[in-house]
Amino acid sequence: MNEAEGLRQRRPLRPQVITEDSPAQEAKEGSAYSSKVFRVTFLTLAASLAVPLLGATVLLDCPIDPQPISLKEPPLLTGVLEPNNKLQKAERLWENQLVGPESIVNIGDVLFTGTADGKILKIEDGEVQTVARIGHGPCGTPEDEPTCGRPLGIRVGPNNTLFVADAYYGLYEVNPGTGETKMLVSTKTLIEGQKLSFLNDLTVTQDGRKIYFTDSSSKWQRRDFLFLVMEGTDDGRLLEYDTVTKEVKVLMVGLRFPNGVQLSPAEDFVLVLETAMARIRRYYVSGLMKGGADMFVENMPGLPDNIRLSSSGGYWVAMPVVRPNPGFSMLDFLSEKPWIKRMIFKLLSQETVTKLLPKRSLVVELSETGSYRRSFHDPTGLTVPYVSEAHEHNGYLYLGSFRSPFICRLNLQHV
Protein backbone atom coordinates (compact mmCIF):
# COMPACT_ATOMS: atom_id res chain seq x y z
CA MET A 1 0.00 0.00 0.00
CA ASN A 2 1.56 3.33 -1.02
CA GLU A 3 1.39 6.55 0.96
CA ALA A 4 -1.43 8.04 -1.09
CA GLU A 5 -3.68 5.08 -0.47
CA GLY A 6 -2.99 5.26 3.28
CA LEU A 7 -4.01 8.88 3.40
CA ARG A 8 -7.22 8.12 1.58
CA GLN A 9 -8.10 5.42 4.11
CA ARG A 10 -7.39 7.71 7.08
CA ARG A 11 -9.56 10.57 5.73
CA PRO A 12 -12.31 11.26 8.31
CA LEU A 13 -15.89 10.31 7.39
CA ARG A 14 -18.27 13.13 6.53
CA PRO A 15 -21.18 13.45 8.88
CA GLN A 16 -24.38 11.95 7.52
CA VAL A 17 -27.32 14.29 7.02
CA ILE A 18 -30.61 12.74 8.04
CA THR A 19 -33.32 14.02 5.72
CA GLU A 20 -36.31 12.11 7.15
CA ASP A 21 -38.11 13.71 10.16
CA SER A 22 -38.15 11.77 13.42
CA PRO A 23 -41.56 10.70 14.87
CA ALA A 24 -41.25 13.29 17.69
CA GLN A 25 -40.57 16.05 15.23
CA GLU A 26 -43.53 14.98 13.11
CA ALA A 27 -45.81 14.99 16.13
CA LYS A 28 -44.64 18.42 17.19
CA GLU A 29 -45.12 19.94 13.78
CA GLY A 30 -48.48 18.17 13.36
CA SER A 31 -49.67 19.50 16.70
CA ALA A 32 -48.60 23.01 15.80
CA TYR A 33 -50.43 22.74 12.49
CA SER A 34 -53.60 21.39 14.13
CA SER A 35 -53.49 24.15 16.74
CA LYS A 36 -53.13 26.75 14.02
CA VAL A 37 -56.05 25.27 12.10
CA PHE A 38 -58.18 25.23 15.29
CA ARG A 39 -57.36 28.85 16.07
CA VAL A 40 -58.16 29.98 12.57
CA THR A 41 -61.39 27.97 12.50
CA PHE A 42 -62.46 29.19 15.96
CA LEU A 43 -61.72 32.82 15.18
CA THR A 44 -63.52 32.56 11.85
CA LEU A 45 -66.56 30.99 13.52
CA ALA A 46 -66.51 33.53 16.36
CA ALA A 47 -66.31 36.38 13.89
CA SER A 48 -69.13 34.95 11.78
CA LEU A 49 -71.34 34.79 14.89
CA ALA A 50 -70.18 38.02 16.50
CA VAL A 51 -70.79 40.22 13.47
CA PRO A 52 -74.54 39.47 13.12
CA LEU A 53 -74.94 39.39 16.91
CA LEU A 54 -73.27 42.78 17.23
CA GLY A 55 -75.36 44.05 14.37
CA ALA A 56 -78.51 42.78 16.02
CA THR A 57 -77.69 44.37 19.36
CA VAL A 58 -76.97 47.68 17.64
CA LEU A 59 -79.89 47.72 15.22
CA LEU A 60 -82.63 46.06 17.29
CA ASP A 61 -84.69 48.16 19.66
CA CYS A 62 -84.66 47.33 23.36
CA PRO A 63 -88.07 47.47 25.06
CA ILE A 64 -86.56 48.61 28.36
CA ASP A 65 -84.21 51.34 29.53
CA PRO A 66 -82.55 49.57 32.46
CA GLN A 67 -81.00 51.53 35.28
CA PRO A 68 -78.20 50.21 37.50
CA ILE A 69 -79.59 49.05 40.84
CA SER A 70 -77.32 48.63 43.83
CA LEU A 71 -78.21 45.55 45.87
CA LYS A 72 -76.32 44.34 48.90
CA GLU A 73 -74.78 40.88 48.87
CA PRO A 74 -77.64 38.45 49.58
CA PRO A 75 -77.86 37.17 53.17
CA LEU A 76 -76.30 33.80 53.86
CA LEU A 77 -78.83 30.97 53.80
CA THR A 78 -77.86 29.68 57.21
CA GLY A 79 -79.62 29.25 60.54
CA VAL A 80 -83.34 29.91 60.18
CA LEU A 81 -82.88 30.47 56.44
CA GLU A 82 -80.97 27.24 55.81
CA PRO A 83 -82.37 25.47 52.71
CA ASN A 84 -84.75 22.57 53.27
CA ASN A 85 -87.41 20.63 51.37
CA LYS A 86 -90.40 21.59 53.49
CA LEU A 87 -92.44 23.14 50.67
CA GLN A 88 -92.17 19.84 48.82
CA LYS A 89 -94.48 18.36 51.46
CA ALA A 90 -97.32 20.50 50.09
CA GLU A 91 -100.14 18.88 48.14
CA ARG A 92 -101.59 20.22 44.91
CA LEU A 93 -105.31 20.96 44.88
CA TRP A 94 -107.79 21.66 42.07
CA GLU A 95 -105.10 21.07 39.45
CA ASN A 96 -106.07 22.32 35.97
CA GLN A 97 -109.36 23.71 37.32
CA LEU A 98 -107.87 27.19 37.70
CA VAL A 99 -104.75 29.05 36.58
CA GLY A 100 -102.69 31.69 38.32
CA PRO A 101 -104.44 31.89 41.73
CA GLU A 102 -102.38 34.91 42.81
CA SER A 103 -104.07 35.70 46.14
CA ILE A 104 -106.33 33.67 48.43
CA VAL A 105 -108.84 34.52 51.18
CA ASN A 106 -111.41 32.55 53.11
CA ILE A 107 -114.88 33.22 54.53
CA GLY A 108 -115.32 30.37 56.94
CA ASP A 109 -114.09 27.31 55.08
CA VAL A 110 -114.93 28.73 51.66
CA LEU A 111 -111.91 29.93 49.66
CA PHE A 112 -111.85 32.75 47.12
CA THR A 113 -109.16 33.65 44.59
CA GLY A 114 -108.62 35.63 41.40
CA THR A 115 -107.19 33.91 38.34
CA ALA A 116 -105.32 34.61 35.11
CA ASP A 117 -108.49 34.32 33.01
CA GLY A 118 -110.01 37.33 34.76
CA LYS A 119 -112.30 35.37 37.08
CA ILE A 120 -112.99 35.56 40.79
CA LEU A 121 -113.54 31.99 41.94
CA LYS A 122 -115.18 30.35 44.94
CA ILE A 123 -114.00 26.96 46.18
CA GLU A 124 -116.58 25.30 48.40
CA ASP A 125 -116.66 21.62 49.38
CA GLY A 126 -113.96 20.96 46.82
CA GLU A 127 -115.96 22.46 43.94
CA VAL A 128 -114.63 25.41 41.93
CA GLN A 129 -117.27 27.96 40.89
CA THR A 130 -117.11 31.35 39.17
CA VAL A 131 -118.39 34.21 41.33
CA ALA A 132 -117.70 37.14 39.01
CA ARG A 133 -115.46 38.55 36.36
CA ILE A 134 -114.52 42.17 35.90
CA GLY A 135 -113.23 42.13 32.32
CA HIS A 136 -114.37 40.14 29.30
CA GLY A 137 -112.95 37.60 26.88
CA PRO A 138 -111.01 36.54 25.01
CA CYS A 139 -108.41 35.51 27.59
CA GLY A 140 -105.27 33.41 27.59
CA THR A 141 -102.53 35.53 26.02
CA PRO A 142 -100.56 38.58 27.20
CA GLU A 143 -102.26 40.60 24.47
CA ASP A 144 -105.67 39.72 25.93
CA GLU A 145 -104.87 40.67 29.54
CA PRO A 146 -105.86 44.36 29.44
CA THR A 147 -109.42 43.50 28.32
CA CYS A 148 -109.68 40.13 30.07
CA GLY A 149 -108.66 41.68 33.38
CA ARG A 150 -106.34 40.25 36.01
CA PRO A 151 -107.56 40.18 39.63
CA LEU A 152 -104.51 40.13 41.89
CA GLY A 153 -104.83 41.08 45.56
CA ILE A 154 -108.06 40.00 47.27
CA ARG A 155 -109.33 40.71 50.81
CA VAL A 156 -112.43 40.16 52.93
CA GLY A 157 -114.23 43.24 54.24
CA PRO A 158 -116.10 43.60 57.55
CA ASN A 159 -119.45 42.60 55.99
CA ASN A 160 -117.96 39.53 54.26
CA THR A 161 -117.73 41.36 50.97
CA LEU A 162 -114.63 40.94 48.83
CA PHE A 163 -112.29 43.76 47.91
CA VAL A 164 -110.29 43.06 44.76
CA ALA A 165 -107.44 44.86 43.01
CA ASP A 166 -107.62 44.22 39.28
CA ALA A 167 -104.34 45.11 37.59
CA TYR A 168 -106.05 46.67 34.56
CA TYR A 169 -109.47 47.86 35.68
CA GLY A 170 -109.09 49.16 39.22
CA LEU A 171 -110.27 48.63 42.78
CA TYR A 172 -113.56 46.72 43.19
CA GLU A 173 -116.00 45.53 45.82
CA VAL A 174 -117.55 42.15 45.00
CA ASN A 175 -120.57 40.48 46.59
CA PRO A 176 -119.51 36.82 46.97
CA GLY A 177 -123.12 35.66 47.08
CA THR A 178 -124.59 37.45 44.07
CA GLY A 179 -121.42 38.17 42.08
CA GLU A 180 -122.33 41.85 41.84
CA THR A 181 -119.28 44.08 41.30
CA LYS A 182 -118.90 47.73 42.25
CA MET A 183 -116.03 49.89 41.03
CA LEU A 184 -114.35 51.93 43.75
CA VAL A 185 -111.32 53.33 41.91
CA SER A 186 -110.87 53.22 38.13
CA THR A 187 -107.47 52.93 36.50
CA LYS A 188 -108.67 55.57 34.04
CA THR A 189 -108.60 58.13 36.84
CA LEU A 190 -105.43 60.19 37.15
CA ILE A 191 -104.21 60.32 40.74
CA GLU A 192 -102.13 63.44 41.33
CA GLY A 193 -101.47 63.64 37.61
CA GLN A 194 -100.27 60.07 37.24
CA LYS A 195 -102.19 57.14 35.79
CA LEU A 196 -102.75 53.81 37.51
CA SER A 197 -101.20 51.21 35.20
CA PHE A 198 -100.57 48.24 37.45
CA LEU A 199 -102.79 47.86 40.52
CA ASN A 200 -101.39 45.01 42.56
CA ASP A 201 -102.34 44.34 46.18
CA LEU A 202 -104.49 45.83 48.92
CA THR A 203 -105.12 45.68 52.65
CA VAL A 204 -108.28 46.83 54.45
CA THR A 205 -108.88 48.23 57.94
CA GLN A 206 -111.11 46.16 60.21
CA ASP A 207 -113.93 48.71 59.98
CA GLY A 208 -113.66 48.79 56.18
CA ARG A 209 -113.12 52.56 56.12
CA LYS A 210 -109.62 52.65 54.58
CA ILE A 211 -108.10 50.57 51.80
CA TYR A 212 -104.36 50.78 51.23
CA PHE A 213 -103.20 49.58 47.83
CA THR A 214 -100.17 49.51 45.55
CA ASP A 215 -99.77 50.73 41.99
CA SER A 216 -96.59 48.96 40.89
CA SER A 217 -95.84 51.31 37.99
CA SER A 218 -97.31 54.09 35.90
CA LYS A 219 -95.27 52.92 32.89
CA TRP A 220 -95.51 49.12 32.87
CA GLN A 221 -98.58 46.88 33.03
CA ARG A 222 -98.83 43.53 34.77
CA ARG A 223 -98.11 41.58 31.58
CA ASP A 224 -94.72 43.35 31.49
CA PHE A 225 -93.78 42.69 35.11
CA LEU A 226 -90.37 41.27 34.14
CA PHE A 227 -89.57 44.48 32.25
CA LEU A 228 -90.42 46.35 35.44
CA VAL A 229 -88.07 44.18 37.52
CA MET A 230 -85.22 44.39 35.04
CA GLU A 231 -85.57 48.07 34.26
CA GLY A 232 -85.74 49.04 37.92
CA THR A 233 -88.35 51.74 37.30
CA ASP A 234 -88.98 53.78 40.46
CA ASP A 235 -92.47 55.07 39.64
CA GLY A 236 -94.44 52.82 41.99
CA ARG A 237 -96.74 54.20 44.71
CA LEU A 238 -98.64 53.33 47.87
CA LEU A 239 -102.13 54.85 47.93
CA GLU A 240 -105.07 55.15 50.33
CA TYR A 241 -108.75 54.99 49.42
CA ASP A 242 -111.40 56.25 51.84
CA THR A 243 -114.64 54.30 51.33
CA VAL A 244 -116.69 57.09 52.94
CA THR A 245 -115.28 60.23 51.29
CA LYS A 246 -114.31 58.35 48.07
CA GLU A 247 -110.99 60.20 48.11
CA VAL A 248 -107.68 58.71 46.98
CA LYS A 249 -104.40 59.90 48.50
CA VAL A 250 -100.83 59.12 47.53
CA LEU A 251 -98.82 58.07 50.59
CA MET A 252 -95.48 56.92 49.14
CA VAL A 253 -93.76 57.54 45.79
CA GLY A 254 -90.47 56.52 44.18
CA LEU A 255 -90.92 52.81 44.90
CA ARG A 256 -89.33 50.13 42.71
CA PHE A 257 -92.10 47.61 42.02
CA PRO A 258 -94.22 47.96 45.19
CA ASN A 259 -96.14 44.72 45.47
CA GLY A 260 -97.80 43.08 48.50
CA VAL A 261 -99.18 45.21 51.35
CA GLN A 262 -100.29 44.36 54.87
CA LEU A 263 -101.65 46.38 57.79
CA SER A 264 -100.13 45.59 61.17
CA PRO A 265 -102.42 43.89 63.71
CA ALA A 266 -102.70 47.22 65.57
CA GLU A 267 -103.33 49.04 62.27
CA ASP A 268 -100.70 51.65 63.05
CA PHE A 269 -98.55 50.97 59.98
CA VAL A 270 -98.65 49.38 56.53
CA LEU A 271 -95.89 47.10 55.26
CA VAL A 272 -95.04 47.49 51.57
CA LEU A 273 -93.00 44.86 49.74
CA GLU A 274 -90.60 46.52 47.30
CA THR A 275 -89.95 43.59 44.98
CA ALA A 276 -87.15 44.95 42.79
CA MET A 277 -85.15 45.96 45.88
CA ALA A 278 -85.73 42.74 47.87
CA ARG A 279 -86.96 44.62 50.93
CA ILE A 280 -89.99 45.68 52.99
CA ARG A 281 -90.79 49.31 53.74
CA ARG A 282 -93.01 50.51 56.59
CA TYR A 283 -95.39 53.46 56.37
CA TYR A 284 -97.06 54.76 59.55
CA VAL A 285 -100.78 55.52 59.21
CA SER A 286 -101.51 56.46 62.83
CA GLY A 287 -99.80 57.47 66.06
CA LEU A 288 -96.86 59.79 66.63
CA MET A 289 -95.05 58.51 63.53
CA LYS A 290 -98.04 59.06 61.22
CA GLY A 291 -96.90 60.02 57.73
CA GLY A 292 -93.38 58.76 58.31
CA ALA A 293 -91.66 55.77 56.76
CA ASP A 294 -88.71 53.53 57.54
CA MET A 295 -87.20 50.17 56.65
CA PHE A 296 -88.82 47.06 58.13
CA VAL A 297 -86.71 44.31 56.51
CA GLU A 298 -83.74 44.99 54.25
CA ASN A 299 -81.84 42.71 51.88
CA MET A 300 -84.16 39.70 51.84
CA PRO A 301 -83.08 36.27 50.51
CA GLY A 302 -85.43 36.57 47.54
CA LEU A 303 -87.76 38.91 45.67
CA PRO A 304 -90.91 39.23 47.81
CA ASP A 305 -94.37 39.09 46.27
CA ASN A 306 -97.29 39.09 48.75
CA ILE A 307 -97.40 39.39 52.52
CA ARG A 308 -100.11 38.18 54.91
CA LEU A 309 -100.63 37.89 58.67
CA SER A 310 -99.60 34.72 60.48
CA SER A 311 -101.50 33.25 63.42
CA SER A 312 -98.56 33.99 65.71
CA GLY A 313 -98.84 37.74 65.15
CA GLY A 314 -96.12 37.88 62.50
CA TYR A 315 -96.17 37.82 58.72
CA TRP A 316 -95.91 35.29 55.91
CA VAL A 317 -93.89 36.44 52.90
CA ALA A 318 -93.80 34.49 49.62
CA MET A 319 -90.79 34.74 47.30
CA PRO A 320 -90.98 33.26 43.78
CA VAL A 321 -87.35 34.20 43.08
CA VAL A 322 -84.55 33.28 45.49
CA ARG A 323 -81.16 34.99 45.84
CA PRO A 324 -79.04 31.99 46.86
CA ASN A 325 -75.94 32.63 48.96
CA PRO A 326 -73.81 30.61 48.61
CA GLY A 327 -74.78 30.23 44.99
CA PHE A 328 -75.37 32.31 41.89
CA SER A 329 -78.13 34.91 41.69
CA MET A 330 -78.79 36.00 38.11
CA LEU A 331 -80.74 39.08 39.19
CA ASP A 332 -77.97 40.23 41.51
CA PHE A 333 -75.39 39.63 38.79
CA LEU A 334 -77.38 41.74 36.32
CA SER A 335 -78.39 44.47 38.78
CA GLU A 336 -75.51 46.83 37.95
CA LYS A 337 -75.01 45.71 34.33
CA PRO A 338 -77.65 47.54 32.25
CA TRP A 339 -75.84 46.77 28.98
CA ILE A 340 -76.28 43.02 29.51
CA LYS A 341 -79.97 43.53 30.28
CA ARG A 342 -80.37 45.47 27.05
CA MET A 343 -78.71 42.71 25.05
CA ILE A 344 -80.88 40.03 26.69
CA PHE A 345 -84.16 41.79 25.93
CA LYS A 346 -83.12 42.71 22.41
CA LEU A 347 -82.73 39.01 21.66
CA LEU A 348 -85.17 37.22 23.99
CA SER A 349 -88.83 37.62 24.91
CA GLN A 350 -90.13 38.03 28.47
CA GLU A 351 -91.62 34.55 28.34
CA THR A 352 -88.28 33.02 27.32
CA VAL A 353 -86.39 34.84 30.07
CA THR A 354 -89.02 33.82 32.63
CA LYS A 355 -88.56 30.18 31.68
CA LEU A 356 -84.77 30.53 32.04
CA LEU A 357 -85.03 31.81 35.62
CA PRO A 358 -84.64 29.11 38.30
CA LYS A 359 -88.04 27.99 39.66
CA ARG A 360 -86.90 27.93 43.25
CA SER A 361 -89.54 29.01 45.81
CA LEU A 362 -89.25 30.30 49.36
CA VAL A 363 -91.76 31.22 52.06
CA VAL A 364 -90.63 32.87 55.30
CA GLU A 365 -92.42 33.76 58.50
CA LEU A 366 -91.38 37.06 60.05
CA SER A 367 -91.89 38.10 63.64
CA GLU A 368 -93.84 41.24 64.50
CA THR A 369 -90.51 43.13 64.46
CA GLY A 370 -89.27 41.72 61.15
CA SER A 371 -86.86 38.99 62.28
CA TYR A 372 -86.95 35.59 60.58
CA ARG A 373 -88.80 32.90 62.52
CA ARG A 374 -88.74 30.03 60.02
CA SER A 375 -88.41 29.31 56.33
CA PHE A 376 -89.89 26.76 53.94
CA HIS A 377 -88.03 25.99 50.70
CA ASP A 378 -88.65 24.18 47.44
CA PRO A 379 -85.11 24.14 45.95
CA THR A 380 -86.34 22.69 42.66
CA GLY A 381 -89.65 24.51 42.29
CA LEU A 382 -91.19 21.28 41.05
CA THR A 383 -93.85 21.10 43.78
CA VAL A 384 -94.47 24.80 44.46
CA PRO A 385 -93.33 26.88 41.47
CA TYR A 386 -93.93 30.63 41.09
CA VAL A 387 -95.26 31.05 44.64
CA SER A 388 -96.97 34.41 45.13
CA GLU A 389 -98.70 34.24 48.52
CA ALA A 390 -98.99 32.20 51.70
CA HIS A 391 -102.45 32.41 53.28
CA GLU A 392 -102.85 30.70 56.66
CA HIS A 393 -106.16 29.07 57.54
CA ASN A 394 -107.06 26.35 60.03
CA GLY A 395 -103.52 24.98 60.44
CA TYR A 396 -102.67 25.03 56.74
CA LEU A 397 -100.79 27.35 54.43
CA TYR A 398 -102.60 27.84 51.15
CA LEU A 399 -99.98 28.79 48.58
CA GLY A 400 -100.98 30.98 45.66
CA SER A 401 -99.14 31.33 42.36
CA PHE A 402 -99.17 33.92 39.60
CA ARG A 403 -99.06 31.27 36.85
CA SER A 404 -99.43 27.69 38.15
CA PRO A 405 -102.67 25.77 37.38
CA PHE A 406 -103.28 24.75 40.99
CA ILE A 407 -103.23 25.83 44.64
CA CYS A 408 -100.80 24.13 47.01
CA ARG A 409 -101.66 23.34 50.63
CA LEU A 410 -99.06 22.76 53.32
CA ASN A 411 -99.94 21.20 56.68
CA LEU A 412 -98.07 23.31 59.24
CA GLN A 413 -98.07 20.46 61.75
CA HIS A 414 -95.89 18.43 59.38
CA VAL A 415 -93.14 21.03 59.03
From Swiss-Prot:
InterPro entries membership: 6-blade_b-propeller_TolB-like (IPR011042), Strictosidine_synth_cons-reg (IPR018119)
Segments passing through the bilayer: 40-60
Compartments in which it is found: Membrane
UniProt keyword annotation of Transmembrane present: yes
Pfam families: SSL_N, Str_synth
Chain intervals for the UniProt region annotation (Disordered): 1-30
Glycosylation sites: 159
Domain of life of the native organism: Eukaryota
Residue intervals annotated with topology Cytoplasmic: 1-39
Side of membrane Extracellular, spans: 61-412
Gene Ontology CC entries for this record: cell surface; membrane
Assigned keywords, A-Z: Glycoprotein, Membrane, Signal-anchor, Transmembrane, Transmembrane helix
Membrane topology recorded in Swiss-Prot or TrEMBL: Single-pass type II membrane protein
Main localization, broad class: membrane
SUPFAM superfamilies assigned to the protein according to its UniProt record, in alphabetical order: Calcium-dependent phosphotriesterase
Similarity annotation: Belongs to the strictosidine synthase family.
Name of this chain's protein: Adipocyte plasma membrane-associated protein
Taxonomic lineage: Eukaryota, Metazoa, Chordata, Craniata, Vertebrata
Gene: APMAP
